[in-house]
């Protein structure tokens, strides 16, 4: 899906706990027909730390970041990437479908500019979809977070707002998080549904 949407390269981090995952990615790397893949193998204490491992590969151009447990429709993602290419700031995927153990609520204004990220519902319509399209200057915010001992991607997102980076929300029809084995069947059913046409 990243190749189909114009990725120059695909940067992946996997942990050392499941060697079969690394083996699978290395198998993909040997196959033709996709953007070049860079692989980091490192076990980290949080998602922000994993991002930090990838950061040296991302700091020279706009990039899209997501996690392995985020499930979304391919056509939603394609529209999201097209919108990001047309803008100047960061574009964060959001959804009004809430089926997450600990959702991160996203505050927005009337123009979908992001005003904050909240652990509880403060009257927000959307939650984070776990897909982040950002400009290279976001790496400076990441480095500040690491220097301050922060962890978790939700705290990185808050820091982007603190630093005054321009962020907009991009609503997707539905985004699922696969946190447990029981979520796999739910994700498969979601992906097999016929998409509802967007207005």
Protein language model regions, located:
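The conserved acidic donor/metal-binding loop of glycosyltransferases
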Residues: 67-71
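Catalytic-core segments of class I nucleotidyltransferases/pyrophosphorylases
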Residues: 113-176, 182-198
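Conserved core of the sugar-phosphate nucleotidyltransferase
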Residues: 73-147
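A short acidic, often aromatic-flanked loop/helix-cap motif at beta-alpha or helix-coil junctions
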Residues: 44-49, 99-101, 175-178
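A conserved hydrophobic position in a structured secondary element of the catalytic/binding core
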Residues: 16, 66, 133-134, 179
């Amino acid at each position: 899906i990243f190749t189909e949407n114009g990725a120059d390269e695909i940067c992946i981090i996997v942990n050392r706990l499941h060697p079969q995952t690394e083996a699978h990615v290395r198998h993909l790397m040997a196959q033709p027909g996709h953007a070049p893949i860079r692989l980091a193998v490192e076990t980290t204490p949080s998602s922000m730390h994993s991002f930090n491992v990838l950061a040296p590969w991302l700091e020279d151009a706009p990039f899209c970041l997501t996690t392995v447990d985020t499930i979304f429709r391919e056509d939603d993602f394609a529209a999201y990437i097209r919108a990001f290419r047309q803008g100047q700031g960061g574009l964060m995927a959001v959804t009004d479908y809430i089926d997450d153990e600990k959702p991160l609520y996203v505050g927005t204004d009337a123009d979908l500019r992001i005003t904050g990220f909240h652990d509880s519902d403060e009257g927000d319509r959307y939650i984070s979809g776990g897909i982040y399209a950002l400009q290279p200057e976001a790496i400076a915010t990441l480095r500040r977070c690491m220097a301050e001992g922060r962890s978790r991607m939700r705290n990185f997102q808050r820091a982007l707002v603190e630093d005054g980076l321009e962020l907009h929300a991009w609503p997707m029809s539905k985004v699922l998080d696969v946190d447990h084995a029981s979520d796999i069947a739910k994700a498969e059913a979601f992906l097999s549904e016929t998409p509802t046409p967007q207005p």
